[in-house]
Amino acid sequence: MKMSNMKEKLHTTELYLPNDETIMTEQLKCLDRLYDFNMTRPTELDKRQKLMKEMFAEVGENCYIEPPFHSNFGGKHCHLGNNIYFNFGVTLVDDTHVYIGDSTMLGPNVVIATAGHPILPELRVKAYQYNATVHIGKNCWLGAGVIVLPGITIGDNTVVGAGSVVTKDLPPNVIAVGNPCRVLREINEHDREYYFKDKK
């Protein structure tokens, strides 16, 4: 595999070497911008918004990210809709594309990983990896500490419970929990009446 072709494989799910010089040069520029974002003061909201427009592939209106925010490519491959909220400590392993729909919330320390490594030790020792795009729908809520693995799609309005590890696609309009994450139930009329346990 020629090093000159490595960058082309970032978005194809093919194996590639992430230590390719072209990839690393671009990555470091992105990480410099991310560093600047994380060093902003809480009062520098306008500066944060300006940096977000430079960092992300796409960023909608009224998005808020609480530093520190971690990202392999500083958000370069992340596509954010409108009204998105990231709590502190969110990590996007954005070696390829991550799409997050309007009005979705990510709790503290959520990890969305697009990158994986071969099971075969002989390939892994050579530092090969592959990437698979992640899609998070509109109006989702991923609780604290949720981990989403490469190639996953989560449907609109779905809630993923804190600490869950999402290893398979999740449909829209469900509550899903656990490791591995499984659908607990559909969102229903009970949820219109009670917002938390017995609270109306």
Sequence positions of predicted segments:
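Short hydrophobic beta-strand element within catalytic cores of glycosyltransferases
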Residues: 166-167
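Short-chain dehydrogenase/reductase
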Residues: 141, 159, 175-177
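Acidic, glycine-centered active-site loop in nucleotide-sugar glycosyltransferases
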Residues: 170-172, 177-180
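Terminal amphipathic alpha-helical/low-complexity segments used for targeting or macromolecular assembly
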Residues: 1-62, 181-200
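Conserved catalytic segment of ABC-fold P-loop ATPases
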Residues: 155-158, 171-173
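Flexible, glycine/small-residue-enriched loop-and-beta-strand segment within the central core
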Residues: 42, 68-80, 85-154, 179-181, ...
